[in-house]
């Protein structure tokens, strides 16, 4: 991948993950061959590596509207974490790598109004919880 359009980089230690060709790719920080992490998830965006480097949260459009997905940072199957049917963007993680932070316009009258939420990074995802701050 010498030429291309690389978007939304996220870095943890010696690993860089980025979006290109509507998929997630991983490459060592010092350079080398990029490895495709996703395929068949529709358009993907906004990746965020967890602070411990074990997990990768991102937004995928496999079934239409963007939703939050989670996969091991090394690659493998992705799990859909939200079922909001509204626009969303992964913002990052809590420092302990247990909660994914994301913004969404679900439940808002104006589609441009977003709020910040968390969802557990565990297998079942858990409940979407609002972060007690103003609109994003």
Question: Where would I find each of the regions flagged by the language model?
Answer:
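Intrinsic-disorder/low-complexity regions
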Residues: 1-2, 51, 84, 95, ...
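Beta-strand-rich domains and repeat architectures in extracellular enzymes and scaffolds
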Residues: 1-29, 45-47
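Blade-terminus and WD-like Trp-Asp/Gly-His loop motifs, strongest in beta-propeller folds
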Residues: 8-13, 47-55, 91-99
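Cysteine-rich, disulfide-stabilized extracellular repeat modules
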Residues: 12, 33, 52, 77, ...
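A flexible loop/linker signature enriched in serine peptidases of the S9 family
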Residues: 19-25, 39-44, 59-69, 77, ...
